[in-house]
Design a protein with these regions (language model features):
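N-terminal helical cap/lid subdomain that shapes the substrate entry/recognition surface
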Residues: 1-61, 65, 80-81
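Asp-based, Mg2+/Mn2+-dependent phosphohydrolase catalytic module
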Residues: 31-32, 57, 61, 67-189
């Protein structure tokens, strides 16, 4: 998408990425801030650009054996259908999407809806998220255990406020899976 945004300009891919990292480290919406900085126009989101991280399916398979898994997402209508297309809906027990609920992260109500649907107590829940502002902060505000996964567009963010500090930080889904399954003393195979 970066190449699409900078097409026809004199801005290089490297310049865009460098500025994006700069904004991410300030915990700002890096894509939007970079686009504004360069005076560019945001392109439409293409659902066909959505991809799973390479270790997603394997991690979900392992975790689903021992845990109820839910997704809280700021997504348009059709979240379950997209998860089905990716072949992962069968590993997801609860899907709470903003377009269907009329409330979006970071509003704490969306987390409460997910907990209620999952039949899960707050002290039994773990929020795994890639964004500090939309995932970690609101989950911390309601007292949920938090794991920041430094993957995707927000991997370069730098927690500076107390509420931005996660209980655990992992680099990818494989590491997350390993850390969560370790206390169970299971091989995960």
């Amino acid at each position: 998408r970066i190449r699409e945004v900078i097409e026809g300009t004199e801005i290089t891919f490297e310049q865009f990425v460098e500025k994006k990292i700069f904004f991410a480290k300030q915990n700002k919406p890096a894509d939007l801030e970079t686009i504004k900085f360069f005076g560019l126009t945001k392109t439409s989101w293409h659902k066909e650009d959505e991809r799973l991280f390479p270790d997603t399916i394997e991690c979900l398979k392992k975790l689903h054996r021992y845990y109820k898994i839910g997704i809280i997402a700021n997504q348009s209508l059709g979240s379950k259908e997209r998860l089905e297309t990716f072949g992962i809906l069968k590993y997801i027990d609860v899907v709470v999407a903003s377009a269907e609920e009329g409330v979006a992260k970071p509003d704490k109500r969306i987390f409460e809806i997910a907990l209620q649907r999952a039949g899960c107590k707050l002290e039994e829940a773990v929020m795994v998220g890639d964004r500090l502002d939309n995932d970690i902060v609101p989950a911390n505000e309601i007292g949920m255990y938090t794991i920041w996964i430094k993957q995707g567009n927000w991997k370069d963010a730098c927690p500076t406020e107390e509420l931005e500090q996660s209980d655990m930080t992992v680099e990818n889904l494989s590491e997350l899976c390993e850390m969560i399954l370790l206390p169970l003393d299971v091989s995960g195979n």
